[in-house]
Amino acid sequence: MREEKQLLKQEIIDKIQRYPAFVIMQYAGLTANQANDFRRQLGKIGGDVEVVRKRVLLKAAKDAGLELDVSSLNGHIGLVFLGEDPIEATKTVFKFSQEREKIIQVLGGRFDGQIYSGDDVEKLSKLPSKDEMRAQFLSTLEAPMAQTLAVVEALLASVAYCLDNKSKQGSEEPENSASEA
């Protein structure tokens, strides 16, 4: 293997080991502007794209301890390394693909050390992102507290209303008893 390919292979191995998740994509008809736009969108959320030859990818995966299905790897291949929130980055990949007439096809991916097919990766992309899950969790925690607070406020308001009525009744009684005498 030539020195350039060795360096590329080592770079791929380093990224496979550094990133907890990645997606293997096939692209066709992707222009330079579209590729730059894709890289920019992924860069905003901590992702990275690496275009790689099939042989280099297979050797790098083997050296990194991964077994990839060779039969699904056809055409131009790229790796999308997903940042801290792999679901959000995967959503970005599928959104980009759908907006541009599916010029990117996801062949598979790795999440938390597990290899998934393209269909499974698409299903994972439909899950809520970490931020969405945090918001759902906090709203789940907040709802009972908000309801409890509303009940306590209603009780305090009713106690205040009762005391106000009692004080009004107390101030009216001396006038009534004075008029009877």
From Swiss-Prot:
Signal peptide: none annotated. It holds the Pfam family Ribosomal_L10. Keywords: Ribonucleoprotein, Ribosomal protein, RNA-binding, rRNA-binding. The keyword Cytoplasm does not apply. Part of the ribosomal stalk of the 50S ribosomal subunit. The N-terminus interacts with L11 and the large rRNA to form the base of the stalk. The C-terminus forms an elongated spine to which L12 dimers bind in a sequential fashion forming a multimeric L10(L12)X complex. Forms part of the ribosomal stalk, playing a central role in the interaction of the ribosome with GTP-bound translation factors. The keyword Transmembrane does not apply. Belongs to the universal ribosomal protein uL10 family. GO terms for biological process: translation. Gene3D superfamilies: 3.30.70.1730, 6.10.250.290. It comes from Protochlamydia amoebophila (strain UWE25). HAMAP family: Ribosomal_uL10 (MF_00362). This is Large ribosomal subunit protein uL10. GO terms for cellular component: ribonucleoprotein complex; ribosome. GO terms for molecular function: large ribosomal subunit rRNA binding. It comes from the Bacteria. CDD domains: Ribosomal_L10 (cd05797).
